[in-house]
Amino acid sequence: MKTFKPLAMIILLISLSCKSKQNTSVRQENLPAGKIVKNTAKGTLFIMGGGKISKSLIEELISTSNLKNDDFIVILPMASEEPDSASYYAKKSFVEVQVNPDKIKTFNLKKEQQSIYQIDSIKKASLVYITGGDQNLFMSQILHTPAYDAIHTAYLNGATIAGTSAGAAVMSREMITGIEYKHSQYSGNFRTIESENFEIKEGLGLMPSAIIDQHFIYRMRMNRLLSVVLEHPDKKAIGINESTAIIVHGDSAVVAGESQVIILKNPNKNSVKTKNGLLGGENILIDILLPGEKFKL
């Protein structure tokens, strides 16, 4: 009987490993560790808050990506319910700033259909661009796939990873899904600051120290971000307004575009309290940054 113990232990470990990957939807549970703990990546994140993206912001994105003759762009439109349309307009915006259309690849990836060519292209791209839409749709096709790893490889090796709207939300490890548990009838009007109200799922984890919200000032999402920073006091909560971006390299970032970025911090982690489902806290810090201003992550 003793000879079977090692085999039994292996089976047990495999079983536990599989169970740990099954549920990525959480409220207050800890998410699994992301690929990047400390930002040692050679690449850059170009995170846009959605809305109308100006030609000058696209030009800055292309400049940041430092595209050379043999370099190319990969567009990932899986967040959109109309990926062909999302790809068309993304490609059009790049061509309008003199990017050669032959240097632009589009992959509407499916979780179970990711070719070696597609994965290698993502790894070698100088710019990976994630369109807007629904961040949950995007992650449903990317999480625990070769494409997820390929995006991380590209970023670590020096690529620019860009996204707008939903493509911004996925940059976080703890990703705001947009789902409100307690008041779904409000349809995006975040009227309360309550505990366990906003769904958080696993994102790409390229920006593990912060949680991103987008369309921030225009859609009045302060209550949501306050709830997030109270329940996740170890993270910076960053609200990026429309037509605006943060450009992240290493542990530093700069604001670009036309509007502001709001940063919430909760340094007094032990001050968070709840009463009848309401969230409270003390000494929450807020920064309102203008285009050109820099901050540390």
Positions of predicted regions on the chain:
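Sec-dependent signal peptide recognition
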Residues: K2-M9
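C-terminal motif of bacterial Sec signal peptides marking the signal peptidase cleavage site
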Residues: L16-S17
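Catalytic nucleophile loop
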Residues: I130-G132, Y155-I176
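Portal/gating segments that form or line small-molecule/metal binding sites
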Residues: E81-K124, L137
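Catalytic-core regions built around general acid/base machinery
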Residues: S121, P146-G158
